[in-house]
């Protein structure tokens, strides 16, 4: 047998907001002093991690010095992932579906791991320039609706998807809504005209933005969170690189009326943030150029009070495994990085810039190429990037809306039934009237992936096995995500000494011959594993002619994983799967 071993606390005062005057005319009471305030105005302090050792939900132990300042921005060596070098002896699996994106869960296997790319929706683009704000010329570019970063989230209170996007190149911040991610409406907001939330301008919508819907906000006034770039002249700023404030943090109760901004430390455009619920911290993804575009990291328990980024460290960049475009030849760079909690891991959406250089694109009036790749993390900081193919690829064909300059969005992905949905922006470089420009012709599309479908462990006609490391759980029912309608899956349970438990052996495991993203495992003795709760055990999967994507132990027969579901989806009350099959 060919065996592979281990293949928000406190409310911030709102000074001046946008409001409708008595005559019904919109007034904007943002001035430089209004928008830009210092963190010390609110006695802000960065919530530094406790000096004691931190043990995560999955048994990973973090070092006392956190975030770790161990890497160099000058290095192109792939990021070390310490938890894959020092895996816990026993892994708790109470949180979420357990994915096979790395060897963290695997003691030994004869199955082959295969990574999968997203499939673009055949009806793309699903959202494109239509209004005067979107079609009009700004900064020598036209016909633009883009996620930069914006945000796409499911709002269970409104029972709809909300998309925050930019209308026009460096234009206003706008809102669109949808019931299915495919058909979108532009609600009349009565704020800045049509569906605009904030009009264009460095003190209003800014250069780019990143929006987050925080369904677990302790203060309802901070349900929405945002970072907005404040370049007073975006082109001149890139030339001078002066030290003027460039970003502000904001909160909002409804995503429409926003608080006064708190300035951050110096950073470049396309800086963003995400929430790590496993550690209950806000993680800031900060763009800085050090021999090319790189990412720096800071974190805080409180979103607004973390604006000072006092614990900022170098984080990650494109590395030696990111291949250049064969025709362009430029060294790849990390343009942006968004994160989201999905089931038991953090997903990282890496924007990899392949060139050409900006001046070449401006002179030629065509877009540069960025593509979206995926990374995976179990501690929210260290990224494992085993598959360097584009997860969503630029076509490089000017007839396509996603020819180049692909962007993902805040929230990264959403859940509907047995699929994950990934919103993304693409640029063709051409407007409907034939006008060409580097940042022209931007529309928004969707890409899908099987739920948990980032990687599968696969067997052919010859039976293969996968043995997990010792795990513990408090649930009762074992579930799998498996594709084997022409094959078979059986499961057995072992103790730490690899002795098969008689009542849960492979011979009495009821054969599974199906293609389902949520399938219960049963034995002749039943399906109740509660007697094993708290006891370290191993699962051994026997697979023929099939693909195994994930497994988990649920406390109830619905198969609810109690893991995270990205930016949410219909059928869920929040961003945790407590519904199981009832949300399908």
Language-model-detected regions and their locations in the chain:
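N-terminal secretory signal peptides that target proteins for export/translocation
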Residues: 1-15
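Residue-level detector of transmembrane insertion/anchoring sites
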Residues: 6-7, 23, 170
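Short stretches within intrinsically disordered, low-complexity N-terminal or propeptide regions
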Residues: 11, 24-25, 39
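Bacterial N-terminal signal peptides
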Residues: 18-31
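Carbohydrate-active catalytic/glycan-binding domains of CAZyme proteins
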Residues: 38-584
């Amino acid at each position: 047998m060919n065996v592979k071993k281990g293949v928000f606390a406190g409310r911030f005062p709102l000074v001046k907001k946008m409001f409708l005057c008595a005559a019904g005319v919109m007034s904007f009471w943002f001035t430089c002093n209004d928008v830009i305030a210092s963190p010390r105005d609110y006695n802000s302090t960065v919530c530094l991690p406790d000096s004691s050792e931190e043990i995560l939900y999955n048994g990973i132990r973090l070092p006392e010095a956190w975030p770790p300042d161990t890497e160099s921005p000058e290095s192109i060596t792939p990021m070390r992932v310490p938890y894959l070098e020092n895996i816990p002896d026993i892994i708790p699996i109470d949180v979420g579906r357990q994915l096979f994106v790395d060897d963290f869960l695997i003691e030994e296997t004869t199955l082959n791991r295969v990574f999968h790319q997203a499939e673009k929706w055949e009806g793309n683009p699903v959202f494109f320039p239509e209004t005067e704000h979107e079609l009009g010329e700004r900064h020598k570019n036209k016909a633009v609706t883009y996620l930069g970063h914006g945000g796409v989230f499911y709002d269970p209170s409104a029972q709809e998807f909300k998309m925050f996007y930019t209308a026009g190149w460096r234009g206003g911040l706008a809102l669109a809504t949808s019931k299915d991610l495919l058909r979108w409406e532009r609600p009349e907001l009565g704020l800045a005209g049509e569906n605009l939330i904030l009009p264009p301008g460095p003190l209003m919508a800014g250069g780019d933005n990143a929006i987050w819907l925080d369904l677990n906000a302790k203060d309802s006034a901070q349900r929405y969170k945002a970072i907005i770039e404040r370049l007073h002249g975006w082109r001149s700023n890139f030339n001078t690189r002066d030290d003027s404030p460039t970003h502000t943090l904001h909160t909002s109760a409804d995503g429409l009326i926003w608080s006064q901004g708190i300035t951050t430390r110096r950073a470049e455009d396309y800086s963003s943030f995400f929430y790590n619920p496993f550690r209950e911290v806000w993680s800031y993804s900060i763009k800085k150029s050090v021999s090319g575009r790189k990412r720096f990291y800071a974190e805080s328990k409180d979103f607004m009070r973390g604006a000072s980024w006092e614990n900022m460290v170098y984080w990650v960049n494109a590395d030696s495994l990111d291949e250049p475009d064969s025709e362009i030849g430029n060294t790849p760079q990390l343009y942006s990085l968004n994160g989201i909690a999905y089931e038991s891991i953090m997903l990282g959406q890496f924007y990899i810039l392949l060139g050409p250089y900006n001046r070449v694109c401006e002179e030629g009036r065509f877009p540069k190429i960025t593509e979206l790749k995926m990374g995976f993390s179990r501690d929210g900081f260290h990224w494992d990037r085993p598959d360097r193919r584009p997860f969503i690829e630029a076509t490089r064909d000017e007839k396509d809306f996603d020819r180049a300059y692909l962007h993902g969005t805040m929230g990264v992905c959403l859940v509907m039934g047995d699929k994950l949905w990934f919103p993304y922006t693409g640029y063709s470089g051409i407007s409907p009237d034939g006008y060409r420009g580097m940042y022209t012709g931007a529309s928004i599309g969707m890409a899908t992936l099987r739920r948990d479908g980032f990687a599968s462990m696969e067997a052919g006609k010859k039976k293969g096995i996968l043995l997990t490391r010792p795990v513990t759980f408090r649930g009762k029912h074992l579930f799998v995500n498996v594709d084997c309608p022409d094959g078979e899956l059986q499961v057995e349970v072992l103790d730490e000494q690899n002795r098969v438990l008689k009542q849960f052996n492979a011979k009495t495991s009821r054969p599974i011959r199906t293609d389902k993203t949520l399938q219960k495992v049963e034995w002749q003795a039943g399906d109740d594993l509660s007697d094993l709760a708290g006891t370290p055990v191993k699962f051994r999967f026997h697979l023929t002619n099939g693909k195994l994507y994930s497994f988990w132990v649920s406390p109830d027969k619905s198969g609810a994983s109690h893991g995270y579901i990205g930016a949410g989806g219909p059928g869920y009350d929040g961003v945790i799967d407590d519904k199981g099959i009832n949300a399908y």
